[in-house]
Amino acid sequence: MAEKDSIGDIADDFEEQLVAPAADRVGFLPGLLRWVAIAVGAVIFIVTVVTATALVLAKQGSSHTAYPVSQEFRESRELLQYYESVGLIRTNTADALPGTVVVSVALGYPLNDKTAQQELSARLVELKDFLRSYFQRKTLSELRPEHEQKVKIEIRNEINDNVLSRSKVKDIRFTQFDVLKP
């Protein structure tokens, strides 16, 4: 009987070995699905945290940046179109030891004013000659940065009075304004 018991034990052990590995093995697909579910959950969590953080920061920032401004304090400037075809003007100043002026001028006229645009194009040579002679008459001290606004006003007035006849320039801007001392 002892042999029968030992054979029974062997059979029981063999049976456990056959059944146990099948229960431990889940398979490739369910394991993969588990990792995919973990990754999707992590992505959802990260997106939720980032969105919540962005919303909190946006609410805090908006209260500091939005200031109501009344109509009387808003500056309303006329929209202008700029004529920039004059190009670069290079000339010497009127000093005893002349400096060099290199300037590029943009002439502002009312938006969609075809007359001004046509007249500026037609008088391009006159404009270049006027600007060259204007800067030749000036000294280095008259062309310092603190006098720039005065220079712009003088140029605008002289162009309107002496160069243009059918239209007017409203604004002068320098896209380049270099005064080189000798």
UniProtKB/Swiss-Prot annotation:
Intracellular or extracellular location(s): Cell membrane
Any one biological process term the GO annotation gives: chemotaxis
Membrane topology listed for this record: Single-pass membrane protein
Keyword Cell membrane set for record: yes
Domain of life: Bacteria
UniProt entry keywords in alphabetical sequence: Cell membrane, Chemotaxis, Flagellar rotation, Membrane, Transmembrane, Transmembrane helix
One cellular-component annotation, GO: bacterial-type flagellum basal body
Principal subcellular localization: membrane
Residue spans crossing the bilayer: 36-56
InterPro entries: FliL
UniProt family annotation: Belongs to the FliL family.
Function: Controls the rotational direction of flagella during chemotaxis.
This protein's name: Flagellar protein FliL
Upper classification of the organism: Bacteria, Pseudomonadati, Spirochaetota, Spirochaetia, Spirochaetales
